[in-house]
Swiss-Prot record:
Gene giving rise to this polypeptide: hisE
HAMAP family, per the entry: HisE (MF_01020)
Organism: Pseudomonas putida (strain W619)
Catalytic activity, EC: 3.6.1.31
UniProt subcellular location: Cytoplasm
Protein name per UniProt: Phosphoribosyl-ATP pyrophosphatase
GO cellular component: a single term: cytoplasm
Length: 111
């Protein structure tokens, strides 16, 4: 796993025990999963808007910035649910080389 992701996962776990007024992440954990999901939704919309703007302007700095926010808040959500980022990387690895159509068919119940 990326060293950056691993370090971030460690910090996120540490923030679970921190006082809510000590950090942004600690305050999110204190407010609960619904607040974390609300933030994740906001970041999703901001990323979509930045991508639409980048497609026209060809300036990708905002879409990179917003994607980083989206990934960050996704990691906060996973941590709040007791999941490590490695689980997502493992799932991506599992899918590597697998046709998207085949993967989708494997998830669908047979008729």
């Amino acid at each position: 796993m990326s060293d950056t992701l691993n370090r971030l996962a460690e910090v996120l776990e540490e923030r679970k025990q921190a006082a809510p007024d000590s950090s942004y992440v600690a305050s999110l954990y204190h407010k609960g999963l619904n607040k974390i999901l609300e933030k994740l939704g906001e970041e999703s919309v901001e990323t979509i808007i930045a991508a639409k703007d980048a497609a026209v302007s060809k300036d990708y700095s905002d879409v990179i910035y917003e994607t980083a926010d989206l990934w960050f808040h996704s990691l906060v959500m996973l941590s709040a649910l007791g999941q490590h980022p490695q689980a997502v990387l493992d799932e991506l690895e599992r899918r590597f080389g697998l046709s998207g159509h085949d993967e989708k068919a494997a998830r669908e119940p047979s008729a």
